[in-house]
């Protein structure tokens, strides 16, 4: 069963900021990052528990390249609440 995948406002802003940074660095890198995020969304829609358990109860993490998508189930859907570079101290939400 495919579920919906949504982003919190904060996660959407983080994703936008990362994409803008990558666009300045290299449009090709930004394009590859965006494609990887889309693949991750499809994976979560089909397999919502495919990420590793997060530190906080009820959360999970999915690694996408150098980034970590932190998410939780909201009813039947998946809510991504953080998008962080893996080297950030707070990436392990």
Describe each PLM feature range.
Residues 1-59, 93:
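Basic, Lys/Arg-enriched alpha-helical interface segments
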Residues 24, 64, 68, 72-93:
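Enriched for short, Lys/Arg-rich terminal
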């Amino acid at each position: 069963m495919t579920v919906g995948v949504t982003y919190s406002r904060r996660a959407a802003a983080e994703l936008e900021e990362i994409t803008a940074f990558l666009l300045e660095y290299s449009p090709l890198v930004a394009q590859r990052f965006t494609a990887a995020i889309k693949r991750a969304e499809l994976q979560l829609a089909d397999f919502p528990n495919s990420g590793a358990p997060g530190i906080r109860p009820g959360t999970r993490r999915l690694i996408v390249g150098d980034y970590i998508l932190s998410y939780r189930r909201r009813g039947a859907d998946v809510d991504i609440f953080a998008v962080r570079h893996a080297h950030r101290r707070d990436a392990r939400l």
